[in-house]
Regions:
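Active-site region of the double-stranded beta-helix
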Residues: 27-117
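Eukaryotic intrinsically disordered, low-complexity regions enriched in proline/serine/threonine/glycine
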Residues: 1-39
Length: 117
């Protein structure tokens, strides 16, 4: 992925860097969200009958996420935002499918901007 740094020079801890990530909304003005629909979550929920029943009603967006490009070096920090929509499949509330990092030592911090769970 492309670097969000202004240059390839080492990170300047005194000056920091600017990234396109709004800490109030968690969104980016330049990167479109990726959407995960219920049909893409097949096999993730325990109650298969409830899943099929919900899918027959429609194919809602379960969640969407912004993923900002980062340098893929050990210790770099990933920035992004997940928006989890309200909904249930059987007794389970909607959840994210998960992901993996190509560099295992990539840090992440999750925090809730609004809503409750």
């Amino acid at each position: 992925m492309a670097s969000f740094h202004a240059s390839d020079r080492p990170f300047d801890f005194e000056r920091g860097c600017i990234i396109d990530f709004d800490l109030q909304t968690g969104l980016s003005k330049t990167i479109a969200t990726s959407k995960r629909y219920l049909s893409q979550m097949r096999g993730m929920y325990q109650d298969k009958e409830a899943f099929d029943c919900e899918l027959q009603k429609g194919d809602p967006v379960v969640y969407e996420f912004h993923e900002l490009p980062i340098k893929e070096d050990p210790g770099d920090f990933a920035f992004g935002c997940s928006i989890l929509n309200p909904g249930k499949v059987g007794d389970e509330y909607y959840f994210t499918k998960g992901h993996f990092h190509t560099i295992l030592m990539t840090g992440e911090v999750y925090y809730c901007l609004k809503g409750h769970g």
